[in-house]
Amino acid sequence: MSQGPPPGESSEPEAKVLHTKRLYRAVVEAVHRLDLILCNKAAYQEVFKPENVSLRNKLRELCVKLMFLHPVDYGRKAEELLWRKVYYEVIQLIKTNKKHIHSRSTLECAYRTHLVAGIGFYQHLLLYIQSHYQLELQCCIDWTHVTDPLMGFKKPVSASGKEMDWAQMACHRCLVYLGDLSRYQNELAGVDTELLAERFYYQALSVAPQIGMPFNQLGTLAGSKYYNVEAMYCYLRCIQSEVSFEGAYGNLKRLYDKAAKMYHQLKKSETRKLSPSKKRCKDIKRLLVNFMYLQSLLQPKSSSVDSELTSLCQSVLEDFNLCLFYLPSSPNLGLTNEDEEECESGYAFLPDLLIFQMAIICLMGVHSLKRAGSKHYSAAIAFTLALFSHLINHVNIRLQAELEEGENPVSAFQSDGTDEPESKEALEKEEPEPEPPTVVPQADEGRKSRKHSRLSCLRRRRRHHPPKAGDDSDLSEGFESDSSHDSAQASDGSDSGSDKSLEGRGTAFDAETDSEMNSQESRSDLEDMEDEEGTRSPAQEPPQARSEVPDSLNGPLGPSEASIASNLQAMSTQMFQTKRCFRLAPTFSNLLLQPTTEPNSVASHRPCVNGDMDKPLEPASEDGSESEGSESSNRSCRNERSLQEKLQALMAEGLLPAVKVFLDWLRTNPDLIIVCAQSSQSLWNRLSVLLNLLPASAELQDSGLALCSEVQGLLEGCELPDLPASLLLPEDMALRNLPPLRAAHRRFNFDADRPLLSALEESVVRICCIRSFGHFVARLQGSILQFNPEVGIFVSIAQSEQESLLQQAQAQFRMAEEEARRNRLMRDMAQLRLQLEVSQLEGSLQQPKAQSAMSPYLIPDTQALCYHLPLIRQLATSGRFIIIIPRTVIDGLDLLKKEQPGARDGIRYLEAEFKKGNRYIRCQKEVGKSFERHKLKRQDADAWTLYKILDSCRQLTLAQGAGEEDPSGMVTIITGLHLDSPSALSGPMQAALQAAAHASVDVKNVLDFYRQWKEIG
């Protein structure tokens, strides 16, 4: 600006003002003319005429001149008029009249051109604003103005601070408009710009993270994806932003109304048998709809009844746990193209990002209820902690699946450890598989493909022979079971594998199914979340919280907060409670209490490992959520994987970001940790497992990994309760300005330049944060976790436990093999209808009449399976019995399969159930030396078979310690032989029946037993 006399100085601003007013009048006139055009009934036919397009172009030019001439006073107004009159109103007009616009018509072509032109204009405007004001947005967006490198310096900018602020926000709004235009493009046929629109919105957030408007647009873009859960997350983020968008409240309200309608429709829908793929889709739909409905009830102004809320919380937790077992490309389900088509309308698994969003939704709900002083605050806290417990448990299961890949399962009935050297040798010989590039579950597929059941091998050998006339029965048709389709797929899958014979040991079939035998329900009540299905029964109404909640949760609870603390403990106890009543065969409980390597070392005084004191460890709960085996340290595993393999598994685990965020939130709320320490014990048990799975800082520092200096510096403070510094991770950037994490994010400088971390370095930073949190919790009062530096592990301890940490660590080492098997079992049970089975179990086996009159364990013989398979199937699907299949019975079916179609049907049925993981049908492996009656086998095969089955019954009911229950009435052998006239039976058979009676084992004809069961009802 040239220096001139005072009159000249005063005249220039005056001329600028006059020019500005003249421009503004021209803009208003153009807007008025465009409004007249849009008022016509046939406006959609007129809007793209050349004169109207020219008018819009003129208005656009005037608005651009106006905003740069006087940005402070007219910039925002000019932006708004430009967007609404030139682009938005035209778009809305076309969308309103889309029924009149035919595909590939001239109007549709003009509309597409309109959208493309808008995107081009706003990209150009974005670059021009950056260039004009020399904005540095390289770290925020793709379309940046790059300073001329030949100049070596920036152009001087004479703009005021207010003008610079407008320019920054104008770039933000340009990105939002670009996202909107891409979203409108995405609605057109043949155009897929959803990811582009999403990217523009996130770039707008990076430019102005305090503005919530882009989250509202992201919610609109998400639509009904994942039954509106993704949209709900976006609308909640918008509402909880510093500058929220009013429209998000109405959008969220509409989603909640939809969720309530869908929830009641699902409750009314009849339960019918579905194929495995459809079951998965229905389970996930039920989870997401119920989760949406639950969040609508957990609102500050909600008037829901406490009992309804508690029941719904428990139902959602059950389904959440179940659906986390559903993994992409799960080998157990063997989905064909037909199955995938069935699931096209639904979802077959929960992606990691959706689980992350569900976790953040819970945190946002807790924050809203706390701020409003709602009575549902305690319920929300308890639900969130329980959900986090499930999340950690599944992270443990997935990580252990990777770290223990290739390890041979340990037989559940083996107590002498004779096969251990063979297992170790097999492990040493096996080459490690390459790690999957993306998701962890795919690693399971490689391992599972090498496992074939013995029945699969029998059928595979038979396939080499030419088909006979009677072989039509091999087709898997005519089965009423839900798993018939799955059975066929499983059979085909097994036939496609290696033809290597398993005659020698039969380990693949027996090891997998025997480990499932170890999943029977315990008599004890563990304080965990694993039996939520049992809690579907009407729950106690929790005491209500105070109507007012203090603003801050940080710091110790004062006397005035006692009611909140007691209410929170009560709700947390309800969420983590279990109601289990099943008579466990003594063999199972004794094996759980006594490790295979040192049977007598912990039989009397077993230390409290990870919080379970004086209770048998639980391999798997009824709803599939509990792998309390995963609640002991995996670092004790005898087959340690290399650090590189550990890091590969950790990098591939997509749930770790959610865990890290949860722990950041808990770190800023230590009072919640203390109040819920005892009621949520399984959460800390599982956290101790995760902490022990992670490599320690010394291990990482000594490994020689190529890490940047910032990460190396972070490793030095990894084992401290408070990290001296912290590096920003993608999850931290994504949750910037989120109110529940505001306190946790105070240590971050979001505006400073941050190093670009590799995937490995990001994983190391997460490891540092999680292990530092472990030391932070160990420092809190209440002995929630303790760290033993001697062996380098975290241990979760009950307050009343006085055993030394070293003893507890040793106990964890001894139980490592059991834990590994249990977690493998939990992965393999994904396709079960777990919650239905548990409710059946509790509704039937807890009835005194049924419990006393009928044995819970049934062992059918070969004749029963050959000639009465439909009855066996009904007994198995009733949920009132557990069918045990001894090895002898399988051998008998193998001998009869060539002559008896019933034997082939039995083989097919058992193979399908074992592969599916049915908890009500188990295979039992022979263990130890039994008295071989070779002469009897030649003379009377039926009597010999009964003796062999009786040996299996003894293994099942054998009490290995004092004080066990009387095994009488626990097991019944159901046979296809007629027992009405014992005198008509052979001498050896009569002797076998007497031996069974002496062993307190009932032997009944299958028809008589079935009739008796039906009469009892």
Curated annotation (Swiss-Prot):
Positions of post-translational N-acetylserine modification: S2
Regions of compositional bias (Acidic residues) in chain numbering: 620-629
Residues where Phosphoserine is found: S2, S423
Chain positions covered by the region annotation Disordered: 406-562, 597-640
Biological process annotations from GO: nuclear-transcribed mRNA catabolic process, nonsense-mediated decay; regulation of dephosphorylation; regulation of telomere maintenance
A GO term from the CC aspect: cytoplasm
Keyword Plastid assigned: no
SMART domains linked to this entry: PINc
Residue ranges occupied by any PINc domain in the UniProt entry: 873-996
Keywords: Acetylation, Coiled coil, Cytoplasm, Nonsense-mediated mRNA decay, Nucleus, Phosphoprotein
Ranges annotated as biased composition (Basic residues): 448-467
GO MF annotation terms: histone deacetylase binding; protein phosphatase 2A binding; telomerase RNA binding; telomeric DNA binding; ubiquitin protein ligase binding
Extent of Low complexity compositional bias: 486-496
Cell compartment(s), UniProt: Cytoplasm; Nucleus
Consequence recorded when altering D499E: In strain: Czech II
Residue runs in coiled coils: 798-842
Biological role: Plays a role in nonsense-mediated mRNA decay. Does not have RNase activity by itself. Promotes dephosphorylation of UPF1. Together with SMG7 is thought to provide a link to the mRNA degradation machinery involving exonucleolytic pathways, and to serve as an adapter for UPF1 to protein phosphatase 2A (PP2A), thereby triggering UPF1 dephosphorylation. Necessary for TERT activity.
Quaternary structure and partners: Interacts with TERT, PPP2CA and SMG1. Part of a complex that contains SMG1, SMG5, SMG7, PPP2CA, a short isoform of UPF3A (isoform UPF3AS, but not isoform UPF3AL) and phosphorylated UPF1. Not detected in complexes that contain unphosphorylated UPF1.
Protein name stated in the entry: Nonsense-mediated mRNA decay factor SMG5
Species: Mus musculus (Mouse)
